[in-house]
Amino acid sequence: MASLFDALEAEAFRKGIQARSIEASKLFMKNVAKLGPQTKAILKDERLTTKNKPFIGDMIMYTYNPKFKKTLPYYDMFPLTIMVGPAPGGFYGINLHYLPPKIRAIFLDHLNDTATNQKFNKTTRFKITYNLLKATKKYKYFKPCFKHYLSEHISSNIMKVNASEWNIAIFLQTAKFKKKSDTFVWVQSKKEYQ
């Protein structure tokens, strides 16, 4: 089966669009919108790497069943998370689904400044901490996205998104918000980072 990531990259190449450019981001956003929700298919994508234990700075995807879902106003069952650090019973992470796609792209562009290298390959990670995010104005978008995830409530394999696919992954329609729509969540998030 052809990888979704491969198909999107191939179209950009055919159109002469350079990888990791603004034009590539716009093309990916447009094409992914046509695809519709991709949650189940993405877990089978060959370009993602299964990780038993992800590292701090990895971008990861997984199915999540929150411990306190009955009291949460809304939650995402398929987070796209950048792992920030360890936490009691799990880890702290930035779930990018809490931002609308255009803001995700802006935020990712800022976060790329923290990449451990500019190769954007399997070894590349984000080098971020809560204190860095909190202290730096350009990282203000992290506020509504910063979550505590409990390991025992992860109900699928953890899939690592390699750095070469970060710009594509942020546009995939994999969010699975419960109780409220994506749009509602994004409006609430905007109140936190404005």
Regions found by a protein language model. Name each.
Residues 58-62, 81-83:
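Short hydrophobic/aromatic-rich beta-strand motifs
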Residues 2-60, 68:
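Mixed-charge, Lys/Arg-rich low-complexity intrinsically disordered regions
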Residues 55-56, 86-90:
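A short, compositionally biased
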Residues 69-88:
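Short beta-strand-centered aromatic/proline hotspots
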Residues 89-97:
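Short, solvent-exposed secondary-structure boundary/capping segments
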Residues 63-68, 97-100:
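Short regulatory "switch" loops immediately downstream of catalytic or recognition motifs
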Residues 98-194:
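Intrinsically disordered, low-complexity, charged/polar segments
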